[in-house]
């Protein structure tokens, strides 16, 4: 009986991990889409980010800055320097997607 319980628990944990990975992949895809075109103005207009093929020259080069997701989210919500706030034009989910995308791809080596 105990072996069946452990097997069931392992299967459930595996399924949850699979769903989490699929959700992250969907968020990454949405984040890249927003970075390139959907945000107004698009992040790629100002920022350089190799994964996105973006060569903006106004804002920081994100591959060099390597911000974590919290830093990206804070900049999107509050604005920073010449960068405006996107709080009124982007949903929390979209801010989270861009934050995840930028933080993951800028830190990938």
Which role does the model predict for each range below?
Residues 35-36, 44-80, 88:
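Gly/Gly-Pro-rich "capping" loops immediately C-terminal to redox-active cysteine motifs
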């Amino acid at each position: 009986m105990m072996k069946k319980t452990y097997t069931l628990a392992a299967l459930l944990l595996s399924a949850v991990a699979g769903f989490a990975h699929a959700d992250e992949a969907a968020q990454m895809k949405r984040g890249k889409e927003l970075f390139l075109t959907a945000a107004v103005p698009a992040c790629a207009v100002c920022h350089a980010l190799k994964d996105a093929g973006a060569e903006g020259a106004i804002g920081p080069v994100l591959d060099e800055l390597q911000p974590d997701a919290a830093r990206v989210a804070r900049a999107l919500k509050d604005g920073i320097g010449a960068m405006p706030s996107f709080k009124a034009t982007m949903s929390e989910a979209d801010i989270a997607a861009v934050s995840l995308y930028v933080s993951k791809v800028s830190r990938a080596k």
